[in-house]
UniProtKB/Swiss-Prot annotation:
Gene3D superfamilies: YVTN repeat-like/Quinoprotein amine dehydrogenase. Residues 88-102 have a biased composition (Low complexity). WD repeats lie at residues 97-138, 142-181, 185-224, 228-266, 325-365. Residues 67-102 are annotated as: Disordered. Pathway: tRNA modification; N(7)-methylguanine-tRNA biosynthesis. Forms a heterodimer with the catalytic subunit Mettl1. Interacts with mei-P26 and weakly interacts with bgcn; required for the function or formation of the mei-P26-bgcn-bam-sxl complex. Interacts with nanos; may be involved in mei-P26-dependent derepression of the BMP signaling pathway. Interacts with Myc; the interaction may be mediated by mei-P26 and may be involved in the regulation of ribosome biogenesis. Keywords: Cytoplasm, Developmental protein, Differentiation, Nucleus, Oogenesis, Repeat, Spermatogenesis, tRNA processing, WD repeat. The gene is wuho. One of its GO terms (biological process) is spermatogenesis. This is tRNA (guanine-N(7)-)-methyltransferase non-catalytic subunit wuho. It is found in: Nucleus; Cytoplasm. SUPFAM superfamilies: YVTN repeat-like/Quinoprotein amine dehydrogenase. Its main location: nucleus. It comes from Drosophila yakuba. Belongs to the WD repeat TRM82 family.
Length: 425
C-alpha cells in the first residue's frame, strides 16, 4: 500500500488506502475528501493503444478499447505493448483478493484537475474536476500496469503516466474518450518525469542511471542525455526553462543544463536519495531542494541552491533534519513555507509527523492538538481491521552487482593450494 502527500497551493493533499484528503495549511482543517468508488468499473475493459496504431482506429472510447499494438517491429510484425489490466476485488481480505488503493495524486498546473492513479486489484487513472465542484469524477481509464510517475502539461490539457516497465503514455484531459498515446519507453522503471513549460521536451529518469530529454511531439527523437549518475535517479525538478535538478542513489544532488546535456553542479549527499522536492524562493535564482535519504541517521536534507549571473550554481546552505529517523519507517514528505510534513509506518500503521522547517524540530505551535489523529482517522488508518501499512522496500532500487573476479581468484587460490599439497604428498 502506498501513501502520497503533496503541497499544491493552497492545500496539502494526502492519499492513503481508498481516500484522498485536502487540508488547509493555515488552519489545518480538512475541507474536502475523495473516496474511491467501490468498483472502478474496469471489468472487461482493456487498456487502450496508441492513437497511431492502425488497430486503434476502431477504438473510439475507453469502454470499447482492447489491448493492441502501438508500433511494428522492423520485419513488419506488430508489437503488443499493452495488456489486459489485472482484475481483482476491492477489499483487503484474506481470500487472496488484492485491494485497490490510491498510488499517486497530482494537481494540474491550473488547479482545476486532479489525476489519481490506483494500484492493486484495479489499476486505473481517475480524472477529477477539483474546483469549483467538490471533486467531481470526470473519467476512469484502465492502466495496463501500475503507474510510477504522473505529470500534467503546462496548459493542463493532457497528463503523462509512466509505468513500472518504463512506458510513458499521454492521456487527453479535454477529449476524455480519446485513446492514450504511447510516447516513449525505457528499458527499466521510470521514477520521475517532467514536461517543460513550452511543452517542447519530456524529461525522464530511470533505474539505469539515465536522464533522458525527449523532443515533443516528435518523441521518436531524443534531444539529449544528462549522464553521470552511477545509481538510480530517483527524482527530478524543473528549475528554469533550461535547468533541472536531480537526486540519485549514488549520494549526489546535481544541476544540469538539460538542453545541452551538461552537468553544472554536483553536490555530495550523506546517503542515497530516494525523494526530491524543490521550492522556488526567488524566481530562477534561489531554490530550496529537499531530499529524503535512504536509511540514514538524518532522514531529510534541505539545500539552498543559488544561481549566479554567469550561470554558476552552488549550494550555499545545508540543513539536516533527523525527523526521528530510526524510530519509524519514513516513506514520503512534503514542504510548505514553514513546515515539513512526513509520513511513514510505525508498528505497521500509518503515521504522520510535522516539523518546523526553520529548526528541523517537531512543530510545537500552529498544529492543533489531536490534528494528526483527525487526519489518520480521515484516511481510515485507525479503523479496526485496516490492512497493515508496510512502505515499499527501496532496497530493490539499487543495482545488484556480482563480483565474478573475486570468485575466480578464490577458486584459483584453492586450486594452487591443492596442487602444492599433491606435490608435497
Amino acid at each position: 500500500m502506498c501513501t502520497t502527500i503533496s503541497f499544491a497551493e493552497p492545500e496539502i493533499v494526502l492519499g492513503h488506502g481508498r481516500r484522498v484528503l485536502f487540508v488547509n495549511p493555515d488552519d489545518l482543517q480538512i475541507f474536502k475528501e475523495i473516496e474511491l468508488p467501490p468498483d472502478l468499473g474496469l471489468k472487461g475493459l482493456g487498456s487502450q493503444s496508441q492513437e497511431s496504431c492502425p488497430a486503434a482506429a476502431a477504438a473510439t472510447s475507453t469502454s470499447t478499447a482492447t489491448a493492441t499494438c502501438a508500433g511494428k517491429e522492423p520485419g513488419g510484425k506488430e508489437q503488443q505493448l499493452t495488456k489486459q489490466p489485472e482484475e481483482g476485488g476491492t477489499t483487503a481480505s484474506g481470500s487472496g483478493v488484492t485491494s485497490t488503493s490510491v498510488q499517486n495524486v497530482t494537481y494540474s498546473p491550473d488547479g482545476q484537475l486532479l489525476a489519481v492513479t490506483t494500484s492493486g486489484g484495479q489499476k486505473a487513472l481517475l480524472l477529477y474536476r477539483s474546483r469549483p465542484e467538490n471533486a467531481r469524477l470526470l473519467s476512469t481509464r484502465p492502466l495496463a500496469r501500475a503507474a510510477s510517475a504522473v505529470r500534467f502539461c503546462s496548459d493542463s490539457s493532457s497528463v503523462l503516466v509512466t509505468d513500472k516497465t518504463g512506458d510513458c503514455y499521454q492521456y487527453d484531459c479535454v477529449e476524455l474518450e480519446a485513446p492514450p498515446r504511447l510516447l516513449l519507453g525505457h528499458l527499466s522503471v521510470v521514477y520521475d518525469i517532467l514536461w517543460s513549460e513550452d511543452q517542447q521536451h519530456i524529461i525522464t529518469c530511470d533505474r539505469d542511471d539515465k536522464i533522458r530529454v525527449t523532443n515533443y511531439p516528435a518523441t521518436f527523437d531524443i534531444h539529449s542525455y544528462c549522464l553521470g549518475h552511477r545509481e538510480f535517479v530517483s527524482g527530478l525538478a524543473l528549475l528554469t526553462d533550461k535547468h533541472i535538478a536531480s537526486a540519485s542513489g549514488d549520494k549526489t544532488l546535481r544541476v544540469w543544463n538539460y538542453i545541452q546535456g551538461k552537468e553544472l553542479l554536483q553536490h555530495e549527499l550523506p546517503a542515497p536519495a530516494v525523494r526530491l522536492l524543490v521550492r522556488q524562493l526567488e524566481p530562477e535564482k534561489i531554490f530550496q531542494a529537499a531530499v529524503l535519504f535512504y536509511e540514514h541517521v538524518d532522514a531529510l536534507g534541505l539545500y539552498r541552491l543559488e544561481r549566479s549571473s554567469d550561470d554558476i550554481w552552488s549550494v550555499t546552505a545545508t540543513q539536516l533534519v533527523c525527523a526521528e529517523a530510526g524510530s519509524w519507517s519514513i516513506s514520503n514528505f512534503t514542504l510548505t513555507s514553514d513546515r515539513i510534513y512526513v509520513t511513514g509506518a510505525e508498528n505497521e500503521r500509518l503515521s504522520l509527523r510535522v516539523y518546523d522547517i526553520a529548526t528541523g524540530q517537531p512543530a510545537t505551535s500552529g498544529v492543533p492538538e489531536g490534528w494528526v489523529k483527525m487526519v489518520l482517522d480521515g484516511l481510515g488508518a485507525n479503523e479496526e481491521g485496516a490492512p497493515p501499512f508496510i512502505p515499499e522496500d527501496l532496497s530493490v532500487w539499487f543495482k545488484k552487482r556480482f563480483d565474478n573476479v573475486s570468485d575466480y581468484l578464490e577458486r584459483k587460490k584453492r586450486r594452487i593450494e591443492e596442487q602444492q599439497q599433491q606435490k608435497c604428498g
